[in-house]
């Protein structure tokens, strides 16, 4: 995109800057919604590591604090850096054109500096737990900022797969804070669930926002290969979730039943998409289901440990 085009988009964005508070702008800068949802997976990893190592949360409240704050700062930091990196294409998309780095509420230099500072501060907090937690945090940050935001996002349709690696790391951060060996198979099942779940989740979003991604020049799968291939890919990845609960028998039969029912429900909804004429409506249904799926699944993992 040339400078003239960029300036035109900047001007159009400025004319419709929404009224926001400083706190709202800060939340948008660090993508607080993403931080909050990922904090659930961090806590789940932490909680299950305590459970399977026979440890008490009351004896590890300090580690819980350092883990939640540290991982939250790391995630907020990389989201800041992503806003900085994407400031040229965000004005082209409806869902991102009101970000504070687009509207001018925060200057690019501030977003870059603030992102780096809180990212490093997050690593310091994680270091107060275990070095492995720091390593997991670094892997997640490097994958999201460098491999996804700077490299694959604007070049390859596999950008979704690459980005899903970083989104699968948070439960490992939580687990590593208690058990740095990461030797329990359930720790890696959490990683696999998060990795696989993100792909149909974000492909459904890409279908819903296909015109925006096309205008921004981002080669999402539905932009490059169309809806039919995207729907097939969504189904393949959704089906891949089906066997995973059976490798988590340590959480008991109740969890396995809940997880399997959630998987079957998602698969049934997915197959319905091949009969439905309104692909956009179906993609929204798949996206909403994926959000509920993740919340119910991870909350269930915690709840079943009480029985």
Swiss-Prot record:
It is a multi-pass membrane protein. CDD domains: PT_UbiA_Cox10. The chain crosses the membrane at residues 38-58, 65-85, 108-128, 131-151, 158-178, 186-206, 251-271, 287-307. One of its GO terms (cellular component) is plasma membrane. Keywords: Cell membrane, Heme biosynthesis, Membrane, Transferase, Transmembrane, Transmembrane helix. One of its GO terms (biological process) is heme O biosynthetic process. It is found in: Cell membrane. Its EC number is 2.5.1.141. It catalyses: heme b + (2E,6E)-farnesyl diphosphate + H2O = Fe(II)-heme o + diphosphate. GO terms for molecular function: protoheme IX farnesyltransferase activity. Pathway: Porphyrin-containing compound metabolism; heme O biosynthesis; heme O from protoheme: step 1/1. Interacts with CtaA. HAMAP family: CyoE_CtaB. Converts heme B (protoheme IX) to heme O by substitution of the vinyl group on carbon 2 of heme B porphyrin ring with a hydroxyethyl farnesyl side group. Belongs to the UbiA prenyltransferase family. Protoheme IX farnesyltransferase subfamily. Carbon 2 of the heme B porphyrin ring is defined according to the Fischer nomenclature. This is Protoheme IX farnesyltransferase. The lineage of its organism: Bacteria, Bacillati, Bacillota, Bacilli, Bacillales.
């Amino acid at each position: 995109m040339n400078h003239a085009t960029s300036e035109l988009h900047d001007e159009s964005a400025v004319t419709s800057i929404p009224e926001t508070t400083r706190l709202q702008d800060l939340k948008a800068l660090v993508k607080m919604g993403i931080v909050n949802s990922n904090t659930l997976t961090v806590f789940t990893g932490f909680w299950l590591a305590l459970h399977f190592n026979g440890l008490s949360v009351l004896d590890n409240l300090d580690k819980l604090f350092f883990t939640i704050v540290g991982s939250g700062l790391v995630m907020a930091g990389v989201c800041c850096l992503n806003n900085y990196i994407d400031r040229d294409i965000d004005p082209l998309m409806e869902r991102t054109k009101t970000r504070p780095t687009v509207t001018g509420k925060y200057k690019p230099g501030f977003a870059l500096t603030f992102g780096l500072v809180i990212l490093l501060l997050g690593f310091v907090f994680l270091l107060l737990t275990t070095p492995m937690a720091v390593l997991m945090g670094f892997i997640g940050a490097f994958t999201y900022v460098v491999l996804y935001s700077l490299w694959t996002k604007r070049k390859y349709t596999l950008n979704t797969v690459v980005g899903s690696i970083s989104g699968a790391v948070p439960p490992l951060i939580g687990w590593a804070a208690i058990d740095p060996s990461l030797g329990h198979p359930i720790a890696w099942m959490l990683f696999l669930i998060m990795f696989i779940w993100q792909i149909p989740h974000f492909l459904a979003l890409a279908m819903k926002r296909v015109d925006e991604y096309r205008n921004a020049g981002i080669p999402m799968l539905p932009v490059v290969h169309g809806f039919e291939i995207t729907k097939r890919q969504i189904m393949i990845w959704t089906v891949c979730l089906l066997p995973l609960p059976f490798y988590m028998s340590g959480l008991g039969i109740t969890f396995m039943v809940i997880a399997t029912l959630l998987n079957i429900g998602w698969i049934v909804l997915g197959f319905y998409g091949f009969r439905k004429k309104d692909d956009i409506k179906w993609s929204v249904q798949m996206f909403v289901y994926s959000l509920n799926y993740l919340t119910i699944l991870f909350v269930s993992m915690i709840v079943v440990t009480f029985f």
